[in-house]
Amino acid sequence: LQSRGLGDVYKRQTSHTVILARSFNIPTLVGVDIAALTPWQHQTIYIDGNAGAIVVEPGESVARYYQQEARVQDALREQQRVWLTQQARTADGIRIEIAANIAHSVEAQAAFGNGAEGVGLFRTEMLYMDRTSAPGESELYNIFCQALESANGRSIIVRTMDIGGDKPVDYLNIPAEANPFLGYRAVRIYEEYASLFTTQLRSILRASAHGSLKIMIPMISSMEEILWVKEKLAEAKQQLRNEHIPFDEKIQLGIMLEVPSVMFIICLLY
């Protein structure tokens, strides 16, 4: 049975089902009332991901439109395949890297298969959402190793968990806020949930023994936060040394530039 579209009852676009569907180019809608579609069970319907609509009882002209649209998309993808192995350059000849944005290791294979030269952002918070407890070190390690296998030597930048704020996690006691985008989230929760952060650092470090991984910290706004993160990273490295577990000793650490105040300390980072 080949799936041509998916309606998901969950309201989040971060559910594992949605992520998997997206990685296989399956049109998907979230927050669908599946029960309301019962009268059209075993009948042809069309899922329009661009319009956010499900079309039932399509007339002949509507059916022709969507069939033609599918052919156009297939032809467009085929035309674009010629660029998969080409270098990307600006109009004035400057070489630039085209990197992918992924939320799970299953997306890495599709990203590299479509010509990505690396993963510029692996949004790990998705691994913590839509579940009843946080992922353990072994689970995270296996996920990162799976992504590295698809990378085949190319670089992956892993952003540590940006949870809290507009990305709530039910099993953590993080209160809702009026302005969640710059609130108690990401690096600001790491000290309270230090064991969670250390677990993630250990899993990234362990996976770095198998490929090119880099670490990026979200929502940094002060030098104190950077120094605290570096301290925790050093502790995680020492733990692994004591346990004789290999990792990349020279793994790169960076920050995501997204908080305005970080611009006042950017010169101190070099």
Language-model region placement:
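Single conserved hydrophobic/aromatic residue that forms the stacking wall/gate
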Residues: 1-10, 270
